[in-house]
Amino acid sequence: MRFDILTLFPEFFETPLRIGLVGKALQQGIAEVHCTNPRDFATDKHRRVDDEPYGGGVGMVLKPEPFFAAVASLPRLDPCEIILLTPQGQPLNQALLQELAQKAQLILLCGQYEGFDERIRQYLATREVSLGDFVLTGGEIPALALINGVVRLLPGTVGKVDSLKSESFQAGLLDYPQYTRPAEFQGHKVPPVLLSGDHQAIARWRLQQQLVRTWQRRPDLLAKRPLTAEEQQLLAEGLAEQHPGVNDVEK
């Protein structure tokens, strides 16, 4: 898979893309990342990529010409998405990462200043993506988050594929609690079921923990995911164990 990042600060990506699973994936050729500076495509002697907004206002707006020219210079793979990283975009979530991981190429447009000329949004980008309901100084951090989230889904990046299936958001639920040695630490013990060797009981406990944790922390996720009768029962039992007297779950 090929990532092309259009950024005024290509040096921002040098270290993060060399470390961890993403760094290994790039070394192994599972994915490749290329940075292009739109300033290299500015045509005036000062290599300006921004200008004052028409109609007045504070700040500077990124000009369309350098970004259109930079994108036109890139090799294209199919299917490709040209993604504008902006707070106005579609929220980045696991479902979107899974969709983007099916593409052959992602071109990421990183903004600065007051944002992009609207013609970049309308006639160049094919999608807008947001990291959340907050504003950063630029699109570089969202670009890194998107690359990290997509690359780890590519075949060969994560050693155990099953670990991807059970983690948070993959089934519309948060992940279950994880424990390792020692079995007791400062008086806090690992749940006995995890030491029992009963794989069916462990799977049931883990699903119950996912349901309870999601209900407590992200009820919005459960609103989007119909529960089976078994899951409703597991959730009710799990909540009753934590909060005696709770024996009904709103369906």
UniProtKB/Swiss-Prot annotation:
Key words, A-Z: Cytoplasm, Methyltransferase, S-adenosyl-L-methionine, Transferase, tRNA processing
Binding site for S-adenosyl-L-methionine: 111, 131-136
Catalytic activities: guanosine(37) in tRNA + S-adenosyl-L-methionine = N(1)-methylguanosine(37) in tRNA + S-adenosyl-L-homocysteine + H(+)
Tagged with keyword Transferase: yes
GO MF annotations in UniProt: tRNA (guanine(37)-N1)-methyltransferase activity
Listed GO biological process terms: tRNA N1-guanine methylation
Family: Belongs to the RNA methyltransferase TrmD family.
Name the UniProt record assigns to this protein: tRNA (guanine-N(1)-)-methyltransferase
Organism: Synechococcus sp. (strain JA-2-3B'a(2-13)) (Cyanobacteria bacterium Yellowstone B-Prime)
